[in-house]
Amino acid sequence: MDVIKKKHWWQSDALKWSVLGLLGLLVGYLVVLMYAQGEYLFAITTLILSSAGLYIFANRKAYAWRYVYPGMAGMGLFVLFPLVCTIAIAFTNYSSTNQLTFERAQEVLLDRSWQAGKTYNFGLYPAGDEWQLALSDGETGKNYLSDAFKFGREQKLQLKETTAQPEGERANLRVITQNRQALSDITAILPDGNKVMMSSLRQFSGTQPLYTLDGDGTLTNNQSGVKYRPNNQIGFYQSITADGNWGDEKLSPGYTVTTGWKNFTRVFTDEGIQKPFLAIFVWTVVFSLITVFLTVAVGMVLACLVQWEALRGKAVYRVLLILPYAVPSFISILIFKGLFNQSFGEINMMLSALFGVKPAWFSDPTTARTMLIIVNTWLGYPYMMILCMGLLKAIPDDLYEASAMDGAGPFQNFFKITLPLLIKPLTPLMIASFAFNFNNFVLIQLLTNGGPDRLGTTTPAGYTDLLVNYTYRIAFEGGGGQDFGLAAAIATLIFLLVGALAIVNLKATRMKFD
């Protein structure tokens, strides 16, 4: 007789499909919202990941994919999606002055107004639970008063000329400030039909829209008569001359447009960007290579020393040498920043007492770079030492015994046996270390902040900047505005450079050991 296994209520198919249906509706709603807001890339990504997840968890045939999907979704969301966004921004003029869409920038400009008529002093007087608005003309001495009204909506108030003062005490500045938004929504209509609106905390004045949108998409300045046309090459409304050519004036805010390869060509054609970019690229490669070499060399030598059988207190030495790895790197970096202080740092005090010198660690490019390499070696050698300590255990003692019988010394053992046997398994880790130091943002940012600065550059750049720090400074610290498009272009180039260097290193390693 077949045994029918009883299902719990939470295992029922009805509940499963209900939950999946609700999730599908929620995802659909979010995708529509993103699409309506113009966030097309976010909408597409959410739709793809959510649809794939719902299909995998709803279909029994895709059961095996349930174990793979979370990792793939995470990689797509946190690796591929930011990469695609960065590359997409690199082909636009997206910056602090060009963040809005064309429609939103046009709306902001059309909302601007200018004072085009008389100015009237105003007062606000209580009328029970309501208020009365009183205006006075300083030139003619005429007074105008509205009927009682309540705050809370856009409204038009018809004012009448009066000679009597309103009853009650005039509202003070605090009350006016608290109701400033409501007062800004009021349009006061004078007996002659002129309309005035609040222009300051004490005045109403005749205001008109500063710009008028013409049928051909041109904006006309109602105050000066200048016409502006959208220039989709630069993403601004730009003035046009009488003969139809572009003028010099641009209206802010601008809007985001596609610029093609402009940001990439700027990197190689604009001397103010090209020179610091190439110099920073060379320094980044040199910094990464020297750091990898020194950390591996120091770590390997120390690992051999603490594994030496004749050494007493090896456990204590191991703990002391691994301590830099246990301390968070940002704490160590800030401590070194104090130690290297040019005026009060302990390192300069010691060098001054012993040799009579006080290096300018933060103002001289050479000593600043030397300081970075010293600090980075201190931070990186414990990791390499731990790896080498583990790898040394895998080297058979027979090799050293045989070399001892041949009369080999410690140096011959190290260069003929230890180094060749350690360098092969360390190679992939050295490549990973190179890639990490190529983008070692935290060290530069906390220790030198890229300084000392380079002179005569279009973008902010320093002698100790790595490419990633240079990109950050362009995006967030530019004196002429934050240029996200150019920063994204440089970030894309960094991605290609790191990827190419990693591929070359891997192929070179494979050729060497094959």
Curated annotation (Swiss-Prot):
Pfam families: BPD_transp_1, MalF_N_TM, MalF_P2. It is found in: Cell inner membrane. InterPro entries: MalF_N, MalF_N_TM, MalF_P2, MalF_P2_sf, MetI-like, MetI-like_sf. The keyword Cell membrane applies. It comes from the Bacteria. Residues 37-39, 93-283, 342-369, 436-483 are periplasmic. Keywords: Cell inner membrane, Cell membrane, Membrane, Sugar transport, Transmembrane, Transmembrane helix, Transport. Residues 1-16, 58-69, 307-318, 393-412, 507-514 are cytoplasmic. GO terms for cellular component: maltose transport complex. Residues 281-505 form the ABC transmembrane type-1 domain. One of its GO terms (biological process) is maltodextrin transmembrane transport. It is a multi-pass membrane protein. Belongs to the binding-protein-dependent transport system permease family. MalFG subfamily. The complex is composed of two ATP-binding proteins (MalK), two transmembrane proteins (MalG and MalF) and a solute-binding protein (MalE). Part of the ABC transporter complex MalEFGK involved in maltose/maltodextrin import. Probably responsible for the translocation of the substrate across the membrane. This is Maltose/maltodextrin transport system permease protein MalF. It comes from Escherichia coli O157:H7.
